[in-house]
C-alpha cells in the first residue's frame, strides 16, 4: 500500500483580500474605520439603553445583546486582518486559527438566533399585546439569551473539534482574510464529507430554522397590521418592524450566499464580498438603522448626550 508523507501544519497563511498590496493597505484603513464605527455605534446603543429607563423592555434588552454580539463578531476578524496587512505578517498559528473559527461561528450563530427572538418579540407585542408582559418577562428573556449562548458555543465547539481532527498535507495557504469553515475544508487532505454534512444539517438547522420563524412571525404580523383600522397604528407597527426586517434581509441574504451555495477551491470574489457584507457591513449599519429609524432610541440618545453635556459644564 502506498504511503504518503504527511506534514503537520503548525500555522496557516491568510492571503487576505484578492487585491494588490497597495489596495490591501487602503482596504485595511477602510476596514479599521468600519470597525471603529461598529464598535462605537454599538457601544452607544448599549449605553443609551442602560441610561434610559424607558428603554428597559424586552425589545431593547435583545437589541443591547445584539449590539454586544456585533462588537464581538467584528472583533474576531477585523483587528487580526488589519494587523496582518500593516505588518506584512500573514501567518496565524493552528491554535489561533481554531480559536478564531470557534468565536466566529459562535457569534454568527448568536446573531442569527437573536434576530429570530427579536422577531418573536415583535410578533407578541403586535399580535398579542395583552399577553406581552406575561410572555416576555425579564426572567424569561435572561434565561432565553443564556440558552442561546449555550447552544451557539456547543455548535461552535462541534465544528472546531471536527476541524482539529482533519489532516492538512497539501497546502497551508487560506484564500481568505480569516479562518472560516469552507476555506479550511478546501485545504484538508482528509475526507471532509462528514464535516460538510454537519454544516448543512446542524448549521442549516441553526440558520434556516430561525429564518423560517422570522418569516412566519412577520407573516402573522403583517396579517394583523392589515386588520388595524387606525392609520397611525399601522404606521407605528410598520416602523417598529422595518428596522429589524432591514437587518434580517442584509444579514441572512449575504450569509446564505456564502455557506449554502456552491464554492470553488479558491474562494471567489463574490463569496469574499458576501462575507464582508454580513461580517462587517451589517454590524456597522445596525446602530444607524436602529437609532435613525427608532423614535424611542433617538429620544434616549438625545437625553443621554444632553446629560453628558450638562455634566461636563458643571
From Swiss-Prot:
Annotated function: Odorant receptor.
Residue spans, topological domain Extracellular: 1-25, 80-100, 159-195, 260-272
Cellular component, GO annotation: membrane; plasma membrane
CDD domains named among the record's database cross-references: 7tmA_OR1_7-like
Cell compartment(s), UniProt: Cell membrane
GO MF annotations in UniProt: G protein-coupled receptor activity; olfactory receptor activity
Annotated organism of origin: Homo sapiens
Family classification: Belongs to the G-protein coupled receptor 1 family.
Stretches that traverse the bilayer: 26-49, 58-79, 101-120, 140-158, 196-219, 237-259, 273-292
Membrane-topology annotation of the record: Multi-pass membrane protein
Keyword terms: Cell membrane, Disulfide bond, G-protein coupled receptor, Membrane, Olfaction, Receptor, Sensory transduction, Transducer, Transmembrane, Transmembrane helix
BP terms from Gene Ontology: sensory perception of smell; signal transduction
Disulfide bond annotation, renumbered to this chain: 97-189
Principal subcellular localisation of the protein: membrane
Cytoplasmic side: 50-57, 121-139, 220-236, 293-314
Highest taxon above the source species: Eukaryota
Name this polypeptide is given: Olfactory receptor 1C1
Amino acid at each position: 500500500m502506498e504511503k504518503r508523507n504527511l506534514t503537520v501544519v503548525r500555522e496557516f497563511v491568510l492571503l487576505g483580500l484578492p487585491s494588490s498590496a497597495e489596495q490591501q493597505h487602503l482596504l485595511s484603513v477602510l476596514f479599521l474605520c468600519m470597525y471603529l464605527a461598529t464598535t462605537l455605534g454599538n457601544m452607544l446603543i448599549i449605553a443609551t439603553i442602560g441610561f434610559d429607563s424607558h428603554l428597559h423592555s424586552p425589545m431593547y434588552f435583545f437589541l443591547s445583546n445584539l449590539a454586544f454580539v456585533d462588537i464581538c463578531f467584528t472583533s474576531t476578524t477585523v483587528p487580526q486582518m488589519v494587523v496582518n496587512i500593516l505588518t506584512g505578517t500573514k501567518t496565524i498559528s493552528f491554535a489561533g486559527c481554531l480559536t478564531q473559527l470557534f468565536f466566529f461561528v459562535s457569534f454568527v450563530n448568536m446573531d442569527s438566533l437573536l434576530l429570530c427572538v427579536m422577531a418573536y418579540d415583535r410578533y407578541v407585542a403586535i399580535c398579542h399585546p395583552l399577553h406581552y408582559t406575561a410572555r416576555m418577562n425579564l426572567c424569561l428573556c435572561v434565561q432565553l439569551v443564556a440558552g442561546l449562548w449555550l447552544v451557539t458555543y456547543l455548535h461552535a465547539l462541534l465544528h472546531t473539534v471536527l476541524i482539529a481532527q482533519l489532516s492538512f498535507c497539501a497546502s497551508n495557504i487560506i484564500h481568505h482574510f480569516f479562518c472560516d469553515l469552507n476555506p479550511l475544508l478546501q485545504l484538508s487532505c482528509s475526507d471532509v464529507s462528514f464535516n460538510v454534512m454537519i454544516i448543512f444539517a446542524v448549521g442549516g438547522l441553526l440558520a434556516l430554522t430561525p429564518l423560517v420563524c422570522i418569516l412566519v412571525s412577520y407573516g402573522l404580523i403583517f396579517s394583523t397590521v392589515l386588520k388595524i383600522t387606525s392609520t397611525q397604528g399601522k404606521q407605528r407597527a410598520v416602523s417598529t418592524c422595518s428596522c429589524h426586517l432591514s437587518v434580517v434581509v442584509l444579514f441572512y441574504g449575504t450569509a446564505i450566499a456564502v455557506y449554502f451555495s456552491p464554492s470553488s477551491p479558491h474562494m471567489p470574489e463574490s463569496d469574499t464580498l458576501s462575507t464582508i457584507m454580513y461580517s462587517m457591513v451589517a454590524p456597522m449599519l445596525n446602530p444607524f438603522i436602529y437609532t435613525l429609524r427608532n423614535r424611542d432610541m433617538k429620544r434616549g440618545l438625545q437625553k443621554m448626550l444632553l446629560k453628558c453635556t450638562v455634566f461636563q459644564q458643571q
